[in-house]
Amino acid sequence: MRRMLVIRWILAIHLIATQVFAERIKDIATLAGVRVNQLVGYGLVVGLSGTGDKTGTKFTEDSFANMLTQLGINVPPGVRLNSKNIAAVMVTANLSSFMKKGQTMDVNISSIGDSKSLLGGTLLLTPLKGADGRVYAMSQGNVVVSGISASGSDGSSVTVNVPSGGRIPNGATIEADIPNPFYYSNSLTYNLHTPDFTTAKRMSDAINELMGPGTAKAIDAGSVVVTAPKKLSQRVDYVSVLENIEFKPGEAMAKIIINARTGTVVISSNVIVKSAAVSHGNLVVSITETPVISQPNAFASGRTVATQQSQVNIQQKNNRAFILPKGTTLKDIVRGINAVGATPADVISILEALQQAGALSATLIVI
């Protein structure tokens, strides 16, 4: 009995240890077809207090005239419409995969003309289309603007935030469902956020261990295909179990990311440096301009002249060298570079030189 208890404790400790670095499938992979779909439309915002598109903005005038014609109001040819209270806008929205007909979503409104502000405006009925050209939603409502603009008679103006754009909370109603392979496909495909052969293999093994052999198969470094239940009513429970399966992903490639503009350096924990010696020195060049006045003697037929005398001084700082032995890790790299008082710019130079020397076992990426 005691022996069995000890064995159970050992197994429990082993399971805890193996799950310390484990991650859920839902955190590192996305189910194919479950995505956000972008919608876009062109519309008119009316009711502006003289802050709309200026007279002469042709596409706004044409859109206004077409709208009046559709409402049964004839606009005589050649008549120019005053559009100071109207602005042409683009309407955008993100439609989630499982949102249904009749639900509402937020929309963003952005001026495309020379309107100064959309404050107080109302978006007229605007169809929102997907990439396939189909209408998936209709949008209309009062525009909420967080910015404000004011101008004086002398031409001075003050602008806070961006008044030429705004939002309509729940401003679009969904009119059509997005086709989704989740409902009709015989299999489910998980796409890894970061493609990796080891992660894909371990993920398929973890699924097969719980769901049965042959359930999942890694088809490449970025995708794992899982057999789906034929009954649609079982798929929700099935995916709920799948996405909570935990396993240990493969270690990422050793990388060093450098932002040359900001001096930011990010080094992954598995970066290894081969044996190398580093010495990084600095040349400080200073040029000083000193004015010199040349003044002639009294009663002499000369004039006072001011000239510049330049003094150039070059000073080299004697920085210490440090040695990176074979198998040096991230901690040793940071300690060694800090020991010589290197700045972020110096760190970038040192890392680039180490890679050129073949002593850096990592991919160096400069952004």
UniProtKB/Swiss-Prot annotation:
<dbReference type="GO" id="GO:0009428">
    <property type="term" value="C:bacterial-type flagellum basal body, distal rod, P ring"/>
</dbReference>
<dbReference type="GO" id="GO:0030288">
    <property type="term" value="C:outer membrane-bounded periplasmic space"/>
</dbReference>
<dbReference type="GO" id="GO:0071973">
    <property type="term" value="P:bacterial-type flagellum-dependent cell motility"/>
</dbReference>
<feature type="signal peptide">
    <location>
        <begin position="1"/>
        <end position="22"/>
    </location>
</feature>
<protein>
    <recommendedName>
        <fullName>Flagellar P-ring protein</fullName>
    </recommendedName>
</protein>
<dbReference type="Pfam" id="PF02119">
    <property type="entry name" value="FlgI"/>
</dbReference>
<keyword id="KW-0975">Bacterial flagellum</keyword>
<keyword id="KW-0574">Periplasm</keyword>
<keyword id="KW-0732">Signal</keyword>
<dbReference type="GO" id="GO:0005198">
    <property type="term" value="F:structural molecule activity"/>
</dbReference>
<comment type="similarity">
    <text>Belongs to the FlgI family.</text>
</comment>
<comment type="subunit">
    <text>The basal body constitutes a major portion of the flagellar organelle and consists of four rings (L,P,S, and M) mounted on a central rod.</text>
</comment>
<comment type="function">
    <text>Assembles around the rod to form the L-ring and probably protects the motor/basal body from shearing forces during rotation.</text>
</comment>
<dbReference type="InterPro" id="IPR001782">
    <property type="entry name" value="Flag_FlgI"/>
</dbReference>
